[in-house]
């Protein structure tokens, strides 16, 4: 038999996570944003004007943690920490936080030399050898 199984395996990757990460309360999503192609053009002034350093938080989680839109927040896990500005929205489910991928560390106004990638693993996906950002868990707190 050659190739990949045509049936998608939707098993989450918690079994491969370090023990200290499995119990962290938030799943981090870090998709691309339409305002730029990965990080290739982030040096262009009008593209940089778009705030790529937001952390979207569900209203239920934000209320429980005392976080409001515009507050500086800290995401952290055993790999590191990163700072963002909160955006409270129903676009993310409870227990999920969302930041944009490919932020430049040197341009983060909320915490110099921090970005989403400092929280993710170096593990690659089985299909395509891409970064496996979809299985990252973090803490969220007001900074």
What feature does the model see in each segment?
Residues 39-41, 45-143:
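Long, contiguous, secondary-structure-rich segments that constitute the structural scaffold
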Residues 1-45:
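Long, low-complexity segments enriched in small/aliphatic residues
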């Amino acid at each position: 038999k050659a190739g990949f199984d045509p049936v998608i395996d939707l098993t989450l990757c918690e079994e491969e996570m370090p023990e200290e990460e499995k119990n962290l309360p938030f799943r981090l999503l870090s998709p691309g944003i339409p305002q730029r192609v990965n990080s290739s053009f982030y040096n262009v002034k009008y593209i940089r004007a778009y705030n790529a350093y937001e952390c979207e938080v569900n209203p239920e989680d934000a209320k429980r943690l005392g976080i409001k839109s515009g507050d500086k927040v800290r995401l952290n896990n055993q790999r590191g920490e990163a700072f963002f500005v909160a955006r409270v929205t129903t676009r993310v489910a409870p227990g999920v936080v969302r930041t944009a991928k490919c932020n430049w560390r040197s341009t983060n106004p909320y915490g110099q030399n921090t970005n989403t990638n400092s929280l993710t693993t170096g593990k690659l996906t089985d299909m395509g050898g891409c970064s496996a950002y979809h299985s990252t868990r973090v803490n969220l707190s007001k900074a």
